[in-house]
Amino acid sequence: MCIRDSNNDMCRSRMAQEILNSFGRGMKVSTAGILAGNSVPDVVCQVMEQNGYDFSRRKPCDVATYAQQTWDYVITLCPEAEEVQKEMQSVVRKYVSFNFTDPFQGGIHVEDEQEERVRALYDIMHKELYEFFRSELMEKLLPRCSCGANTYCRCE
C-alpha cells in the first residue's frame, strides 16, 4: 500500500500488485492506498503494458476496504503509508516496508521525463520485490512432497 502520489493519482501499489502477481501462483495480492487517488496515470499504464502487465481493469482502492481482514503480510511502499500499521495491528502477521519514491514528485510535465521516472521506478520495484519474494515467500509457495521436501524429490 502507498499514499496517494503527488499528482493525486495512484500507481506504486498497483505496480507492486502486478509485479508480485507475476512471480507465481499461490498468492493473493491486493492493493490499497491511504488517500487513494482517482485513477492510474496513462504513463504508468504505458510503462507497465510495455513490460507485459494489463492495467486496464483495476481501479484504485482505499485501505479501509481491507482494514478488517486478516493478512499474512502488509507491504508499505513509502514511509507515509506506515501510519496504517497502528490501525491494522491486530489483523496483520508481518509488515514489510519499502521506500519507493513518488515518480510525480516535483510536478514534472515533460512526458519523456515522466516516462523515464516511471520506468526507473518499475526497475527498482521489480528488483526489490523479487528479492522480497525470493527470501520471504517462494519457499512457502513451492509444492511439498509427503517427505517434507519443498522441491521435487525422488522418494516415490
Language model features with spans:
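Phosphate-binding/catalytic loops
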Residues: 85-148, 152, 156
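Conserved active-site segments centered on acidic
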Residues: 4-65
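Disulfide-bonded cysteines in secreted/extracellular proteins and peptides
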Residues: 2, 6, 11, 78, ...
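Residue-level detector of flexible, active-site-proximal loop/helix-junction positions
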Residues: 36, 81, 102-104
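Mid-chain, well-packed structural core segment of small domains
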Residues: 69-94
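Short glycine-/acidic-enriched loop or helix-start segments at secondary-structure transitions
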Residues: 14-16, 41, 83-87, 107
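Cytosolic catalytic domains that perform sulfur/thiol-centered chemistry
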Residues: 66-77, 118, 147, 153
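Structural signal for conserved beta-strand scaffold positions within catalytic alpha/beta enzyme cores
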Residues: 31, 76, 96-99
